[in-house]
Regions:
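Membrane-embedded alpha-helical bundles that constitute the cytochrome b-like, heme-associated redox core
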Residues: 1-148
């Protein structure tokens, strides 16, 4: 039985938390009065941070599946156990939703979003309706994670 999370699990946890908080700062600037080139650069920075978080998230899931998690205290009331598990599952679900909605939203714009200088998340399709719809889901997931 696992008593504590592995050191690598803790490192991934805090790296993800720090990158997500810094990335939220970048994302807050999208709605301002930025020049087009600055907005595109911010989107690339945001997407790059998102891809790093995606890698860490997948690694986190693999480690969780492989090594598990510490048991909750036996003295914890049943309702708290349920809420703790629900909150943890909700956080994982929302992180996955955030990743998928971010990548999908980028796919509905033809503005170049080249991550690591290697691949373009955007496409030839410029569908403002779908972009706004999926970006709304992305923003919802962001706000829900903040609320948790």
């Amino acid at each position: 039985m696992m008593i504590d999370y592995l050191r690598i699990q803790k490192i991934i946890h805090w790296l993800m938390a720090i990158i997500i908080m810094l990335d939220l700062n970048v994302a807050q600037k999208f709605g301002g009065e930025m020049e087009l080139l600055d907005r595109l650069e911010s989107r690339v920075d945001h997407a790059t941070a998102g891809m790093i978080v995606t890698f860490l998230f997948v690694l986190r899931i693999i480690l969780r599946y492989r090594y598990g998690a510490p048991s909750l205290p036996q003295t914890m009331p049943l309702w708290q156990t349920y809420l703790a598990k629900l909150g943890h599952f909700g956080l994982y679900f929302l992180m996955g939703l955030l990743i998928v909605s971010g990548i999908t939203a980028a796919n509905f714009t033809n503005d170049p979003i080249v991550v690591f200088g290697l691949f373009n998340l955007s496409s030839e399709v410029d569908n403002l309706y779908m972009f706004e719809l999926i970006r709304g889901i992305h923003e919802f997931a962001t706000n829900a994670i903040i609320a948790l």
